[in-house]
Structures are given as structure tokens and as C-alpha cells.
């Protein structure tokens, strides 16, 4: 684990993709803001971030790879900058999230539970 002191992240506006396992096992990470313009969240990008409670995902995201937020057991609320229809249109690969946890996705036109 290389990010032992990392507690929150605001990813640079110049980033368009979060690569596989970029923040894997950042156990103290509590919040993430992904900027508009990011289109892909890679495999296991935030897997095993056990303290993660807050994430903002932009409407520009079109793909969330396998296990992108898997085993983030404290993550219950996701802020999404697009509509419910845009959220549903995102390609979410298997096990993108922890299956035992119910998430609330806060969209611009209302909330979804998954």
C-alpha cells in the first residue's frame, strides 16, 4: 500500500481516465471528486478503499470497469452530476461495487438506489 496518508482526492481536470488499481487499497481515503471529462474508471481503481464514504462521479463517465469501487463497504452515497438516465447508460462491468451494500445515487433529477 503506497497511499497510507491519503485521505481525500480531487483529481486534476486534465485527467480523462482513472487507470486500473490507481487507488487500490488506500485504506484511509474518505472522499474522492472525479472531474468532468473523465470517461473511464478502471478495473479496481478504488477497490478496498474501506474508509471511502463520499464520491462524486461526473456525467462524462461512460464506463466503470470490473471492481472499480468493490469492497468500499462504507460508501453508501454517490453524487452523480448527470441525470438518472445518464447513470443508467453507464457501462458498469461486473462487481463494480460491493453487492451486499445498497447505494444511493444522487442525480440531478432525483435519487436512485442500487
Identify what each model region corresponds to:
Residues 2-17, 27-40, 50-63, 73-89, ...:
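Structural signature of tandem-repeat unit edges
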Residues 86-98:
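Acidic/polar low-complexity surface segments
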Amino acid at each position: 500500500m503506497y497511499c497510507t496518508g491519503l485521505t481525500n482526492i480531487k483529481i486534476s481536470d486534465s485527467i480523462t481516465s482513472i487507470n486500473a488499481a490507481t487507488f487500490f487499497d488506500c485504506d484511509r481515503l474518505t472522499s474522492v471528486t472525479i472531474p468532468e471529462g473523465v470517461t473511464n474508471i478502471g478495473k479496481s481503481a478504488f477497490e478496498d478503499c474501506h474508509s471511502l464514504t463520499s464520491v462524486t462521479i461526473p456525467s462524462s463517465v461512460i464506463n466503470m470497469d470490473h471492481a472499480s469501487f468493490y469492497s468500499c463497504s462504507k460508501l453508501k452515497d454517490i453524487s452523480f452530476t448527470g441525470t438518472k438516465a445518464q447513470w443508467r447508460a453507464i457501462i458498469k462491468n461486473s462487481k463494480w461495487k460491493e453487492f451486499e451494500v445498497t447505494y444511493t445515487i444522487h442525480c440531478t433529477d432525483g435519487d436512485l438506489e442500487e
